[in-house]
Amino acid sequence: FPTETMEVGTVLFEQGGTDGDGFIVQVGKVVLSRKVCGSVQSGIFVGAGEILGVYKTLFENDARYFTGTVLEKSRIIPIPEQVLKDRIAASDPFIIYCVRNWPNFGDRLIG
């Protein structure tokens, strides 16, 4: 997949969005934020070598829980949602079940 250079302030995805692309951060930093009761909460930082944006597709959620915003100039590899879906579908059903049903895992991601 091609790498894209992203400038500070670029929004990769928005809370409530229904797109499901994932992202690999090669260089730089992205912050995840969430609007709760009218105020924005942030503090989850994703840096080089880390992935983000895959939980919406992995857990078959209707919408994204966070907004992902580039915090410093970054090189990022976007992974299309359909590629993620295809890879998940080709995975061992037991592993898929374990990940999707990990006790309270989804709650910890959004809580």
Give a label for each model feature.
Residues 1-10:
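Short proline/glycine- and basic residue-enriched helix-capping loop/turn segments at helix->loop/beta transitions
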Residues 74-83:
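A short hydrophobic beta-strand segment most commonly corresponding to one strand
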Residues 2, 39-42, 54, 84, ...:
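Glycine-rich, flexible loop/turn motifs
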Residues 10-72:
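Cyclic nucleotide-binding regulatory domains
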Residues 63-66, 82-111:
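A small-molecule sensor/coupling module
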Residues 34-36, 56, 80, 88-91:
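Short, flexible helix/strand-to-coil boundary loops that buttress conserved ligand/catalytic motifs
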